[in-house]
Amino acid sequence: MVITIAGGGSTFTAGIVKSIALRREELEVDEIRLFDINKERQDKVAVVVDWVLHKELNTDIKLVVTTDVQQAYTDASFVFAQMRVGGYAMREQDEKLPLRHGCVGQETCGCGGMAYGMRTIFPMIKLIDDVEKYAKKDYWILNYSNPAAIVSEACRKLRPKARIINICDMPIAIIDVVAAAMGIQNKKEIVYDYFGLNHFGWFTSIQYHGEDLMPKLRAYIKENKILLPESYLKGMGALTSSSSQNRHTKGSWYYVWKGEYEIMENFPEYLPNTYLNYYLQAKEFVEHSDPNHTRANEVEETREKNLFDGIDHYLKTGEVDANTFYAGSHGDWIADLSAALKNDTKARFLIITENRGAIPNMPYDAMVELPAYIGKNGPEVIARDNIPLFQQGLMMQQLNSEKLLVEGCVEGSYEKVLQAFTLNKTVPSMNVAKAILDDMIEANKGYWPELH
């Protein structure tokens, strides 16, 4: 079986490949292909991938590294999509430009997320068309390109029959943190319920061996005033710089996890996705953001630098620090999902899917994030009761903003894109929305379609 990773130059690629290789018997994979339009970057990452496959794990999996679409997708069974259109240079614009107007500057939320979405819609549609043309007829695309909410809505609208499952690892990262906070060794034994949109949802239940963990979690968060356990805080240097309130010192993620405490002080019933901070505490997040040093800069100075410094060191000395080659835990998540699809396991995963009545008081065609059982025919979504009015109201505002953005992008409609920016909860007024949009149009020349 062939698995292709589209966006092979990503810092996450080595970790994903390792997860695939560790499941090589389950997946029956004999070839992994890396595909990217940035040859220089991908060639460097491929050095690490080759080491993982043929030295660390000593597999006989064939590695193909290409910039050619036909070579990348021919006879592929799975395509993992992790594109970042515009790279970190454009991510930096997405984050810093809204901050100049007093609005949240974030990769996937608010105006920055909408800018990123506008750049990604048509490249994702091209990827689907290329895969349809060259891959096996029963292919699956597993897409975790951000912003997943906007991308999944565009796929639903423009390529409704595509065999694509849109996923996000942030809820899984939250469960990782919950497991650490609760002292649970095997996070796979945690069972949870969740509803929302992508980067816009809530855990309604978290159980371990039948025990409801929510009361313990609420108490833990209230006592510590943050969800992160001490080991995580030490890892980001937060415990050594407690007097500073600058994001550059502690890292922007510290405030996102601290925001879990602040949200639950007011709305304690559900555990929120960390991204809800940008909507429910937009003013506060702008106030302690550094407009000259955002998350894009942090990533370039840490994950990016560590990976490519590690590659250079390996090429010069032959010495390997494997810790520099792995970033995040979503490789396991994606590989497990692939195994469920291939082997019809009916394992439970959280996915982004068309609602189709699963949440009765949300639109039928809304792209929602819900648990589903995954088998060879795709997801079987787990339906639930009506959601509370507060969450429904927030979700409808966000959903309609995303739908208008996709419509505006596809139609080339300036008015609809402006409506999307205006409707977004991170933007205080129509005039601010217009000022940001006009600046975004200038910054995204060559990436966005023309708007009239």
Residue ranges with predicted function:
Residues M1-I3:
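Extreme N-terminal starter segment of soluble prokaryotic enzymes
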Residues G9:
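Conserved glycine-rich cofactor-binding loop
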Residues H54-F78, V85, V104-C111, M124-A135:
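A structured beta-alpha segment of the ubiquitous adenosine-cofactor-binding alpha/beta core
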Residues K161-V178:
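Acidic, His- and aromatic-enriched active-site or binding-groove loops in soluble protein domains
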Residues G183-H452:
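Long, compositionally biased stretches enriched for glycine and/or charged residues
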Residues A89-L158:
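Rossmann-fold NAD(P)-binding glycine/threonine-rich loop
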